[in-house]
Swiss-Prot record:
A GO biological-process term: DNA-templated transcription
Keyword hit for Magnesium: no
Assembly, per entry: The RNAP catalytic core consists of 2 alpha, 1 beta, 1 beta' and 1 omega subunit. When a sigma factor is associated with the core the holoenzyme is formed, which can initiate transcription.
Matching SUPFAM superfamilies: RPB6/omega subunit-like
Catalytic activity: RNA(n) + a ribonucleoside 5'-triphosphate = RNA(n+1) + diphosphate
Role according to the record: Promotes RNA polymerase assembly. Latches the N- and C-terminal regions of the beta' subunit thereby facilitating its interaction with the beta and alpha subunits.
Protein known as: DNA-directed RNA polymerase subunit omega
Keywords for this protein: DNA-directed RNA polymerase, Nucleotidyltransferase, Transcription, Transferase
Molecular function terms, GO-annotated: DNA binding; DNA-directed RNA polymerase activity
Higher taxonomy: Bacteria, Pseudomonadati, Pseudomonadota, Gammaproteobacteria, Alteromonadales
Family membership: Belongs to the RNA polymerase subunit omega family.
EC number: 2.7.7.6
């Protein structure tokens, strides 16, 4: 198991409290949403992976927000396409 000091992660984010929020969001993405880690897993838990990504500057609150907006746009586009397909099916009857 990797030993992670949070000082580098805190320095990347700015303060300890925001770092915790960013790390929790990223760990949840990895563990629950199935997002791929940006660093080697090395048999680490999602929280450790999230902290390592933050330390390297790969993850910030802004990158998480942008990723979330992209996910919402993709979901909305899929819903619109599904509705259009249903409407198209009704028009051909």
């Amino acid at each position: 198991m990797a030993r992670v000091t949070v000082e580098d992660a805190v320095n990347q984010i700015g303060n300890r409290f925001d770092m915790i929020l960013v790390a929790a969001r990223r760990a949840r993405q990895i563990a629950v949403q199935g997002k791929d880690p940006m660093v080697e897993e090395e048999n680490d838990k999602p929280t450790v992976i999230a902290l390592r990504e933050i330390e390297l500057g790969l993850v910030t609150a802004d990158t998480l927000d942008a990723d979330e907006r992209q996910t919402v746009r993709e979901r909305e586009a899929a819903e619109i396409a599904a509705v259009a397909a249903i409407a198209e099916g009704r028009n051909t009857i």
